Amino acid sequence: MASIAVCPGSFDPVTYGHLDIIRRGAKVFDKVYVVVLNNSSKKPLFSAEERVQLLEEVTKDLHNVVVDSYQGLLVDYAKSKHASAILRGLRAVSDFEYEMQITSMNRILNEQIETFFMMTNNQYSFLSSSIVKEVAKYNGNISELVPKVVEEALRKKFAHAENHL
């Protein structure tokens, strides 16, 4: 039986930290579904469709990675894809506390799906989409934080927003 994992996130936008986890996960699992979820507590800069397009572009060399979007419970999505695992990246201890809550709830909802945590490489331990957006908003250098296509999309978003003030 093939090992299938779901790697969820808001990916608003996708960063090198996200890609680190996706690439490493693709080496461990036979198939990885990278699924864009909408976090109801966040207002996204990019639409779900835009985030899917960016993820497809930056993962196109990973032949066992499929990008998708979903609204609903992650465990329901995982079950629909016959996934037995949820893959999550951890940056710091503070991430772990939040992730434990989510993992515990997912286990209550579906005990057949295991959550696997992967530590982000040290060079990305500080990195978050929020930080990237803040730096990009003020024209800071983000070339070492996100792929070129994401950097261009951010510059375009913020230039468009500035022109409509």
UniProtKB/Swiss-Prot annotation:
Reversibly transfers an adenylyl group from ATP to 4'-phosphopantetheine, yielding dephospho-CoA (dPCoA) and pyrophosphate. It comes from Anoxybacillus flavithermus (strain DSM 21510 / WK1). Transmembrane segments: none annotated. Pathway: Cofactor biosynthesis; coenzyme A biosynthesis; CoA from (R)-pantothenate: step 4/5. SUPFAM superfamilies: Nucleotidylyl transferase. GO terms for biological process: coenzyme A biosynthetic process. The gene is coaD. This is Phosphopantetheine adenylyltransferase. Keywords: ATP-binding, Coenzyme A biosynthesis, Cytoplasm, Magnesium, Nucleotide-binding, Nucleotidyltransferase, Transferase. The record marks 18 as: Transition state stabilizer. PANTHER family: PHOSPHOPANTETHEINE ADENYLYLTRANSFERASE (PTHR21342:SF1). Its EC number is 2.7.7.3. One of its GO terms (molecular function) is ATP binding. Substrate binds at residues 10, 42, 74, 88. It catalyses: (R)-4'-phosphopantetheine + ATP + H(+) = 3'-dephospho-CoA + diphosphate. It is an enzyme of class 2 (transferase).
